[in-house]
Swiss-Prot record:
Organism in which the protein naturally occurs: Schizosaccharomyces pombe (strain 972 / ATCC 24843) (Fission yeast)
Name listed for the protein in its UniProt record: Uncharacterized protein C26H8.11c
Entry keyword set: Cytoplasm, Nucleus
InterPro entries named in the record: HotDog_dom_sf (IPR029069), PTE-AB_protein (IPR052061), Thioestr_dom (IPR006683)
Localization per record: Cytoplasm; Nucleus
Any one biological process term the GO annotation gives: long-chain fatty-acyl-CoA biosynthetic process
PROSITE patterns the record matches: LECTIN_LEGUME_BETA
Pfam families according to UniProt: 4HBT (PF03061)
Recorded GO MF terms: fatty acyl-CoA hydrolase activity
Cellular component terms (Gene Ontology): cytosol; mitochondrion; nucleus
Length: 175
């Protein structure tokens, strides 16, 4: 049901049809052994997160819906999971800036603003703030979507990512 509501949202449809974005669900498939893919397989996320990545490397938009399995306190999404989702969204947003289209997190700062409640739809919006060779700086916000009400800002993050020069990341990443 949450996924049906998501794909019906005008903003989702607009992103899906926008040629400036790549649309993907990177954690789908049995071969993916990542942390988030395991959460999807164990139904801790209602659906596999949707990623919309600007081809220009300017940022990304990510949608997801956590279940109560991801609560730290009653009905509050665990902060570690929130930071993981912010890290992934920030990373995917800057990857188009790197020749290999891959990189690693060097620094990630998260500020929690309001409780992120379980069983709600969330959107992360990221923006690349600076690109310098194999280095990228980015920021993003986690928003709780509440139907026709204004979104609630739950967390903010900023990150610094690099494309390593001597590490062939493709050997370390399953596609």
């Amino acid at each position: 049901m949450p996924e049906t509501k998501l794909v019906a949202l005008p903003e989702f449809q607009e992103l899906k049809s926008n040629d400036e974005y790549i649309s993907m669900q990177p954690y789908k498939g049995e071969d993916n052994k990542s942390y988030i893919a395991n959460l999807v397989r164990h139904n801790a996320l209602t659906f596999c997160p949707y990623y919309f990545i600007e081809k220009s490397g300017k940022g990304s938009v990510v949608y997801f819906h956590p279940t109560s399995d991801l609560c730290g306190y009653k009905n509050i999404v665990h902060g570690g999971f929130i930071t993981t989702m912010l890290d992934e969204a920030l990373a995917f947003g800057v990857f188009p800036n790197f020749p290999s289209k891959m990189g690693v997190t060097v620094q990630l700062d998260t500020t929690y603003v309001a409780p992120a409640l379980c069983s709600h739809l969330y959107k992360i919006v990221t923006k690349t703030t600076k690109v310098e060779g194999r280095k990228c700086w980015t920021s993003g916000e986690l928003l709780r979507l509440n139907g026709s009400e204004p979104p609630v800002l739950c967390a903010k993050a900023s990150g610094f990512f690099v494309e390593p020069s001597k590490l062939n990341l493709e050997h370390h990443v399953k596609k």
